[in-house]
Amino acid sequence: MIKVNVGDTIRSYDFKPMVGREDCFVEGVVERVTTEQGYKAYKITVTKDSWSDAEDKGRVGKIVFVPVEVSFMEYAGRVINLSRI
């Protein structure tokens, strides 16, 4: 498990990156670690959405809950702490 603190910026992949497929992820600032959605998650304010553009901001500015762990399709690097790179 990675080390994440409140105020850190993380990247969370929606799907495992693969050759030949565009990466799908959000980046955001960690507001807190919470269980308010029924699972342990990083509550983030999204600062970048890989699918957004000038016309459609996607999830930018929205609150997103990133699971700390998942039981299905978990892989190393699903969540990256960009503040510690």
Feature map (PLM): residue ranges:
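Short coil-to-beta transition motif at edge beta-strands of beta-rich domains
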Residues: 2-17
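Conserved beta-strand residues within beta-sheet cores
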Residues: 7, 27-29, 76
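Residue-level recognition of conserved beta-strand positions in structured domain cores
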Residues: 14, 44-46
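Surface-exposed, flexible loop/turn segments at secondary-structure boundaries
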Residues: 18, 36-38
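Short beta-strand-centered aromatic/proline hotspots
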Residues: 21-34
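Short aromatic-glycine-enriched beta-strand elements
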Residues: 38-44
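Intrinsically disordered, low-complexity, charged/polar segments
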Residues: 48-85
